[in-house]
């Protein structure tokens, strides 16, 4: 059955996301943490603006996750506390909601969850059908694809050129972008292969299992009722390989995917095995606290929480044939760095 159509991001207010940390700040220290709300601004632009306003070095302004431009977003940024007086409380399109000092600088990936409030418009499907799909999604989760934001506008082409050279970029940011893009692309291809084979929820010995809400994982030795119950409850999910240096044997499903991959993908994986550290990512994820209501027959409002690194657009794409209204008005100079939610 075709997916129902829906329009996303008709305005920035239709897509709201807020980072959530799960640890207290010390209230003192050399670093100023700011919880900032911004509209129609991406993270890279705001960091450059703060550097301009304060004369702080750009490298000393830190973020946890990179957030999309076409949204209203709340996120944490930090900078040395000595620049606090030079940093205004607001600017064009942004406002600091909270300031706290902390002993440590903000690190990438410090937040644990993202809370979303999303409005979809122009829906052309029966309400009961969509509500049944939402119930199933809450129970079974959705395919945990890296979203298009991860790849920017030209990152795949740039990464492929470095693979063809067999070299790494010298600049740290560009190097991280190349490896991130290639790993995400390979992971998405594995996930698509398991979807096509209908094995996303069918574990086999040798598969890697991920503990929900963490990066901890283990190798499945045997498939029994206890393991299947943990999968069904969402306590664990099957894991997909983020290619890189890997000491343990790869699961049979990953080996089969790699053997069937085209030459370009195989060369990219060998490149990653030389230059990147291996990792694992859950193939499915269940949203927390999912709620919805219908303002009218063709408009759906969704609210839910996802772990850091999972994409709301992937959740939505599992349910709808999406038309992203913001893409029609995207200028070509939007930074193309990968977006880590």
Question: Could you say what each language-model-derived stretch is?
Answer:
Residues 1-341:
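Non-catalytic, substrate/partner-engaging modules appended to enzymatic cores
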């Amino acid at each position: 059955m075709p997916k129902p159509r829906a329009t996303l991001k008709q305005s920035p207010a239709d897509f709201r996301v807020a980072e959530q940390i799960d640890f207290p700040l010390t209230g003192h220290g050399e670093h100023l943490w700011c919880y900032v709300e911004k509209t129609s601004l991406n993270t890279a632009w705001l960091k450059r603006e703060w550097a301009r306003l304060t004369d702080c070095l750009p490298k000393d302004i830190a973020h946890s996750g990179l957030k999309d431009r076409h949204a209203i977003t709340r996120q944490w940024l930090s900078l040395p506390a000595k620049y606090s007086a030079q940093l205004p409380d607001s600017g064009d399109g942004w406002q600091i909601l909270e300031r706290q000092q902390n002993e440590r600088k903000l690190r990438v990936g410090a937040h644990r969850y993202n809370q979303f409030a999303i409005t979809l418009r122009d829906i052309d499907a029966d309400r009961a059908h969509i509500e049944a799909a939402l119930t199933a999604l809450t129970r079974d989760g959705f395919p945990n694809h890296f979203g298009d934001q991860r790849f920017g506008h030209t990152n795949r082409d740039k990464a492929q050129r470095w693979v063809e050279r067999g070299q790494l970029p010298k600049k740290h940011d560009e190097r991280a972008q190349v490896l991130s893009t290639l790993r995400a692309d390979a992971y998405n291809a594995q996930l698509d292969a398991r979807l096509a084979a209908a094995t996303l929820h069918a574990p086999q010995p040798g598969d890697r299992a991920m503990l929900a809400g963490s990066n901890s994982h283990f190798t499945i030795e045997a498939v029994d009722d206890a393991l299947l119950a943990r999968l069904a409850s969402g306590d664990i999910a099957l894991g997909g390989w983020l290619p890189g240096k890997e000491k343990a044997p790869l699961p049979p499903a990953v080996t089969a995917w790699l053997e069937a991959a085209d030459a370009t993908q195989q060369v990219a994986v060998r490149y990653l095995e030389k230059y990147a550290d291996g990792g694992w990512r859950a193939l499915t994820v269940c949203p927390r606290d999912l709620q919805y209501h219908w303002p009218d027959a063709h408009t759906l409002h969704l609210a839910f929480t996802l772990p850091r690194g999972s994409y709301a657009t992937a959740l939505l794409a599992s349910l709808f044939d999406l038309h992203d209204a913001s893409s029609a008005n995207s200028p070509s100079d939007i930074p193309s760095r990968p977006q880590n939610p």
